[in-house]
Regions:
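Helix-loop "lid/cap" segments that line or gate small-molecule binding pockets
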Residues: 158-159, 210-214, 228-234
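Hydrophobic alpha-helical membrane-association signature
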Residues: 32-35, 80-83, 185, 226
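Crotonase-fold acyl-CoA enzyme core
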Residues: 7, 89-204, 236, 241, ...
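Terminal low-complexity tails and localization/encapsulation signals of metabolic enzymes
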Residues: 1-3, 244-257
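A structural preference for short, pocket-lining loop segments at secondary-structure junctions
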Residues: 11-20, 31-72, 90-101, 119, ...
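A short acidic, glycine-rich active-site loop
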Residues: 71-83
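Hydrophobic/aromatic residues within transmembrane alpha-helices
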Residues: 17, 53, 65, 113-115, ...
Length: 257
C-alpha cells in the first residue's frame, strides 16, 4: 500500500509509524485511518518486537477530520467510526507492544489513540482533550478507550467538560506512563519500549493478549482465565528455559521469533 498521510519505517527491532499531515493537524480522515490500520496490520504480521506511533508537527492528532465528516449520511458516518474502532482494536490485538510518542496536542480521536496504545510517553508541553462534551457532539467513541485508561470519574470529567488537561495531569490520571522534557520524548519513548520488549517474544505476545482479555472480566473469571493461560504457558520452551536459566544462574537463551 502506498502511504500518503503516514510513513512506516524500521528502526532496529522497532517499527515506527509516523503521522505526516501536520498542515491538517494530523486530522484523521477516512484515508488516513485506512493507512494507519494497514500499517498496524503489517506490523502485527511482521518480525518487529515493538511499535512506535509518532507524529510530525506540533499536534499529535486533532482527531477526526471534520471536513471529511461533514455531509456524510448515517451509513457513511457509521462506516467511518467503525473503521476508527477497528484501528483501535487492532493496535491492542497485535502481538507487539505499541507506544505513543506524544509531542503536542492530542484531541478527540487523537486522545483516543493515546489511550488505546499500550504505553505512552509525553512531552511536558503536551495537552490532551476530548472537546465534544462542551459542544454539540459528545465524544462517545473516544470515551471507550479513555474509560479503560483512566479512572471512571476522570474519564467522565474529560468527556463532560471538554477541558484540556496538561501532561502532568495526564500522568497523574494514568493516561500516559512518562512525562519528560519535550527534547527527550523520542529518547525516552525508545528507552521505555526497549524495556517493555525485552525477554521472550512469544511470552510477551501471550501476555499482551491475555492482559486485554482479562481486564474487563470480573475477578473470579479473570483469575480462572489467567490461571489457565499461565499454566499452559509454563510448558512452552521459553518458560522452561527461563526456569532452567534461573536455577543455573545464567542468562536465558530464548527462541527467536
Amino acid at each position: 500500500m502506498e502511504y500518503e498521510y503516514i510513513s512506516l519505517a524500521r528502526e532496529d527491532e522497532f517499527a515506527v509509524v509516523t503521522m505526516r499531515r501536520p498542515e491538517r493537524r494530523n486530522a484523521l480522515s477516512e484515508a488516513h485511518l485506512r493507512e494507519l490500520l494497514h500499517a498496524f496490520e503489517t506490523i502485527g504480521a511482521g518480525p518487529a518486537r515493538g511499535a512506535i506511533l509518532a507524529a510530525e508537527g506540533s499536534v499529535f492528532s486533532a482527531g477526526h477530520d471534520f471536513a471529511d465528516m461533514h455531509g456524510r449520511r448515517l451509513d457513511e458516518m457509521r462506516r467511518l467510526l467503525l473503521l476508527c474502532a477497528e484501528l483501535m482494536q487492532t493496535i491492542q490485538a497485535i502481538a507487539q507492544p505499541v507506544i505513543a510518542q506524544v509531542a503536542g496536542l492530542a484531541t478527540a480521536a487523537g486522545c483516543q489513540l493515546v489511550a488505546t496504545c499500550d504505553l505512552a510517553v509525553a512531552g511536558e508541553s503536551s495537552r490532551f482533550q476530548v472537546p465534544g462534551g462542551r459542544g454539540g457532539w459528545f465524544c462517545t467513541t473516544p470515551g471507550v478507550a479513555l474509560a479503560r485508561a483512566v479512572s471512571r470519574k476522570h474519564a467522565f470529567e474529560m468527556l463532560a467538560t471538554g477541558d484540556p488537561i496538561d501532561a502532568a495531569t495526564a500522568l497523574a490520571w494514568g493516561l500516559v506512563n512518562r512525562v519528560v522534557a519535550d527534547a527527550d520524548v523520542e529518547r525516552e519513548t525508545r528507552a521505555l519500549l526497549g524495556r517493555a520488549t525485552r525477554g521472550s517474544v512469544s511470552s510477551k505476545a501471550l501476555g499482551k493478549q491475555s492482559f486485554y482479555r482479562q481486564i474487563d472480566l470480573d475477578v473470579p473469571a479473570a483469575y480462572a482465565y489467567a490461571t489457565e493461560v499461565m499454566a499452559a504457558a509454563s510448558q512452552t520452551e521459553d518458560a522452561q528455559e527461563n526456569l532452567r536459566a534461573f536455577l543455573e544462574k545464567r542468562p536465558p537463551r530464548f527462541s527467536k521469533p
